[in-house]
Curated annotation (Swiss-Prot):
Sequence similarity: Belongs to the WD repeat WDR55 family.
Main location class: nucleus
Compositional bias segments (type: Basic residues): 356-365
GO cellular component: a single term: nucleolus
Keyword terms, alphabetized: Nucleus, Repeat, rRNA processing, WD repeat
Pfam families named in the record: WDR55
Function summary: Nucleolar protein that acts as a modulator of rRNA synthesis. Plays a central role during organogenesis, including thymus development.
Disruption phenotype: Death between 8 and 10 dpf due to multiple defects in organogenesis. Thymus primordium fails to accumulate lymphoid cells. The head, the eyes, the liver and the gall bladder are smaller. Pharyngeal arches are abnormally shaped and lower jaws are malformed. In contrast, hematopoiesis and development of the gills and the gut, as well as body axis formation, are not disturbed at 7 dpf.
Tissues in which the UniProt entry reports expression: Ubiquitously expressed.
Biased composition, class Polar residues, residue ranges: 11-25
Name of this chain's protein: WD repeat-containing protein 55
SMART domains with a match to the protein in the record: WD40 (SM00320)
Amino acid sequence: MAAPPEHAATGSEQTDPPETNSEPDLSQPEPADSDADEPVGPKIRETPEDIRLEAIANTVALHPSRDVLVCGDVDGDVYAYAYSCTEGETRELWSSGHHLKSCRQVRFSADGLKLYSVSRDKAVHQLDVERGQLVSRIRGAHAAAINSLLLVDENILATGDDRGTLKVWDMRKGEAFMDLKHHDDYISDIAVDQAKRILLTTSGDGTMGVFNIKRRRFELLSEFQSGDLTSVALMKRGKKVVCGSSEGTVYIFNWNGFGATSDRFAVKAESVDCIVPITDSIMCTASMDGYIRAINLLPNRVIGCIGQHVGEPIEEINKSWDSRFLVSCAHDQLIKFWEISNLQKTTVSDYRKRKKKDGRMKSLTKKALGDNDFFSGLVEETEKKEEEEEEEEDSDSDSD
């Protein structure tokens, strides 16, 4: 950008030569406006830009040590992206079309060098993360479409299918050393304890299954719950197990008390399809209603809304390697990023605050109620005023 006219040199306007006995002009010229001369740099955003896909993504996984994500879609394609908060720098790295039918789940190995995917075509694929090339394939790994996938360790893989069969694989041999069917419907999710000894499965038949990897045997099924159990996660340093359901209820089990629930919590959502632990007490859940909720466990409380895919069912959520972002994919064919670093510092007291009069959730991110920063700012200011008014009312009531 050219310098403004007022900063241009004026020496050419002098017509008379200077006198020989005059003092030299030692004054420094005014510096040019640095803002005017410097090129405008790329915009730095709070979160990476949304990624628009060609088809609905069923699954999204994030690299364990880099700003890279992978998603699998209903066409069977797998895509890898490098994401960045610098505008315009989020880009596709590679794509793979080796699955013949819908890709149901993708997962990185712990070292981030391998990627595993399962599909409705009943196959298990291993891909090279750097190039996206197919390394190995297990055709016909299940008799039915595979729905869920878990990496137990660098060599052990667990898969669950639409008919309720669980298989545990030794990937060094490409063979399953556990092949058990104790569910009457699809296996929706799989989790493992920190000792890598006990596998937990949730199913559309409304039960949670418990399997012992070390002894290679089935242990027990929980009592039946109303509706499908859709997700499972360990909380409270492994002392609690939480299961989401198709009816919007979170069921809570004590560790080693898997037969019956110790507690339950109605989230008032259409469903609780995905659960991602953020801290020992706080988890994020995703629902068919398009909302991502932050929930505190014991005391059981919906803290607020992390974000939403407006009116679109969310398929999966996962957090980034540095726990800065939560990433979601939904039926709007978008992958969205949500800032959650402040959520880790959140504490919930036993005191239950008065519910908002209009029933809406508290927004926990600037994008929670939409991408318009102006209106989201107004929402935040309104919520702060409401909280201050509530605190004043509570203090007045305490003083009476």
